[in-house]
């Protein structure tokens, strides 16, 4: 597998997660349970953002691949691998902050408000998924070798 195939798989997986998140949010948004409503709002917002990132990332990847000349393929792939690995590790660190922020929200505003507890839980779940997603892909990218 080359870096371009890897990026296609990565963005496709993120898009699937985003569709799942938005679909799940529509099922729980109109719940009488405030906690579920807060969770639904977070799943919807994160799902939309993740979809945007996945679509944009896929488009950028295709454009970069089309610009690469066969004579520069190995060098371009090496640069892309290095760049994407760095982005994934940075995102993994940011995901920890999202999780901590969600926990903080649950333990502050969420103590007295089920809606805010749902918001916090939604951030923890979404941040947790992204942590494992980014970590897995950052670790997996090390197996890719430029052509």
What are these regions (language model features)?
Residues 1-18, 147:
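Cytosolic-side membrane-entry/anchor segment at the start of a transmembrane helix
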Residues 93-112:
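Alpha-helical transmembrane segments and their membrane-interface junctions
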Residues 55-80:
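Membrane-helix interface/capping segments
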Residues 96, 113-138:
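Alpha-helical membrane-associated segments of multi-pass integral membrane proteins
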Residues 10-18, 87-96:
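Select subsegments of transmembrane alpha-helices in polytopic membrane proteins
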Residues 34-52:
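Loop-to-helix transition at the N-terminal end of transmembrane alpha-helices
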């Amino acid at each position: 597998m080359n870096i371009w195939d890897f990026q296609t798989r990565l963005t496709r997986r993120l898009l699937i997660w985003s569709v799942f998140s938005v679909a799940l949010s529509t099922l729980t948004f109109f719940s009488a349970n405030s906690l579920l409503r807060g969770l639904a709002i977070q799943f919807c917002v994160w799902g939309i953002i993740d979809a945007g990132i996945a679509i944009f990332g896929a488009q950028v990847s295709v454009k970069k691949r089309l610009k690469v000349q066969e004579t520069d393929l190995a060098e371009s792939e090496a640069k892309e691998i290095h760049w994407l690995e760095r982005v994934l590790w940075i995102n993994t660190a940011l995901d920890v902050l999202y999780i901590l922020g969600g926990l903080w929200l649950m333990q502050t505003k969420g103590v007295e408000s089920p809606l805010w507890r749902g918001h916090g839980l939604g951030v923890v779940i979404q941040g947790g998924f992204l942590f494992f997603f980014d970590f897995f892909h950052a670790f997996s990218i090390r197996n890719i070798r430029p052509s």
